[in-house]
């Protein structure tokens, strides 16, 4: 789990109220507050419990398959003709993405708290699959809320969840995407507080979720840091990751925040362009507000109503962002940029053909930014990118767009 920060660190948040500057906090229904406080207390005990850490590490090694490899993308580097490009291969984890890191940690907490039922929300389906997987592993029933639009575009993951024994509940409200699924999951939680643990998949939601998810995902950056020192004898010049709610990104960013020589870039879903509403670039084009229990940057209209947003990638299709990212953006430690659907699609194809790796559409956004930046950097410079998920789930979406369907 995450290493303790130094004084005057970018890594010391959140405060006792769960705030990162003006962001974060706990904005929940009165009925949920006792549960949130119980979770906070249990988390405080667990993270200082050697037995909890040992079990987490054991499952990480033998069930998830950690450490994930650090891979030098030799052909991509040669093709772009600039900085050396390394991938942190989170898509090689059990279930095919970074999501399992957090799910294993949280299911251990749920067991400690005596909960007998798991609920989760999912967009791309990767968190749903990871939640259903750990629920099966620990013998707990699992209900996954998923927007009806996402159920349609992520059919392979829906089937996986059902095979794993989870009940998948399509949500037709709104645009039927991740925001709507999260709303339904919160409604379920309010009515089943005694038995149910809500396994949130991203670094958002009410405190302690953003901190907890970050700490479970920080294994990505901790490993990558060590692996980079072994491979190159130094840290990278640039770290890049895709940002939806922001869990894979904060996982790789956080261990590097206090390393001043490392530039950090988060890549948002620019969708069809920032001039309309067909994007999910909360930091680039949003404004502060409250959603799903925390204050952060949101896509909202003048009346504070949440916009639906759009991305080719179901996992980035969220009109908000984790509060720690909002804070890192405002203090200028991390730069956040948008990438359009067509750029991500092109990057998806480039990686597939040059390296024989089919990436998910989420990290394809990060890759598109790497493809832009690498040629402008020196050959002695190094880029580290989080390859957060594999693209099996996206092949039908991509095939349809490229006219390569059956």
Swiss-Prot record:
Which reaction is recorded as catalysed by this protein?
(1S,2R)-1-C-(indol-3-yl)glycerol 3-phosphate + L-serine = D-glyceraldehyde 3-phosphate + L-tryptophan + H2O
What pathway annotation does it carry?
Amino-acid biosynthesis; L-tryptophan biosynthesis; L-tryptophan from chorismate: step 5/5
Q: What does this protein do?
A: The beta subunit is responsible for the synthesis of L-tryptophan from indole and L-serine.
Q: Which InterPro entries match?
A: Trp_synth_b_CS, Trp_synth_beta, Trp_synth_beta/beta-like, TrpB-like_PALP, TrpB-like_PALP_sf
Q: What class of enzyme is it?
A: lyase
Q: How does it assemble?
A: Tetramer of two alpha and two beta chains.
Q: Which domain of life is it from?
A: Bacteria
Any Pfam family matching the protein: PALP
What do the Gene Ontology cellular component annotations say?
cytoplasm
Query: Which HAMAP family does the record cross-reference, listed alphabetically?
Result: Trp_synth_beta
Gene (name only) = trpB
The Swiss-Prot or TrEMBL record describes its family as follows: Belongs to the TrpB family.
Give the disulfide map: none
| Name of the protein in its database record | Tryptophan synthase beta chain
Amino-acid biosynthesis listed as a keyword: yes
- Please state the Enzyme Commission number of this protein: 4.2.1.20
Q: Supply the PANTHER family for this chain.
A: TRYPTOPHAN SYNTHASE, TRYPTOPHAN SYNTHASE-RELATED
Annotated GO molecular function terms are:
tryptophan synthase activity
Cofactor(s) needed by this chain: pyridoxal 5'-phosphate
Q: Which UniProt keywords apply?
A: Amino-acid biosynthesis, Aromatic amino acid biosynthesis, Lyase, Pyridoxal phosphate, Tryptophan biosynthesis
Q: Which residues carry this modification: N6-(pyridoxal phosphate)lysine?
A: 99
Reply yes or no: does the keyword Lyase apply: yes
